[in-house]
Amino acid sequence: MPAELKLQAFGAYVRAAFGELPYHVGSSLENKTGWRDVDVRVILDDDDWQRWGFCDPDYVGHRDEKWIALCLAFSALGREMTGLPIDFQIQPQTWANKKFRGMRGALGFVPHSFVGDVPVYDPAKLKSAALSPAPATAERSPQ
């Protein structure tokens, strides 16, 4: 399977999790050779960034355990799915647009799960679903 399709499939899972399109950015987008990793970024609306509870983006990589855990987890998932050295990060929109002016290639256009001809998720509901609390589950009785 071509690496681009694998990267798009990974992007579909990221999109489902965060409710936003992820972007392929950096040197691997612009050059066929000379890159060391594949940068994938989710750019959240500034209000969504706040709702997720992330801290100041200038210090997030050193102080925000939730941000670090999500970046590590999605980087590992991306490496497993694509075989590429994925560097995944989450960024707030205003900050990202100010700091990074390079090309962005949208990912996540390959649906990751199908039932017949119909995707099992509704892209129109992704944004609200990504920020909704998980439903309460009944406690399990001891066996």
Task: Identify the residue ranges that each predicted region occupies.
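N-terminal regions immediately upstream of nucleotidyltransferase
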Residues: 1-5, 24, 32-35, 52-57, ...
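Active-site ExK catalytic segment of metal-dependent nucleases
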Residues: 43, 57-59, 87-89
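Conserved catalytic core of two-metal-ion nucleotidyltransferases
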Residues: 64-113
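Ala/Thr-enriched low-complexity intrinsically disordered regions
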Residues: 136-138
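Acidic side chains
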Residues: 37-39, 87, 117
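Active-site nucleotide-donor binding segment shared across nucleotidyl transfer reactions
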Residues: 10-55
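Helical scaffold of the NTase/Pol beta-like nucleotidyltransferase catalytic core
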Residues: 1-25, 63-84
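Arginine residue identity/basic-tract feature
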Residues: 15, 36, 41, 51, ...
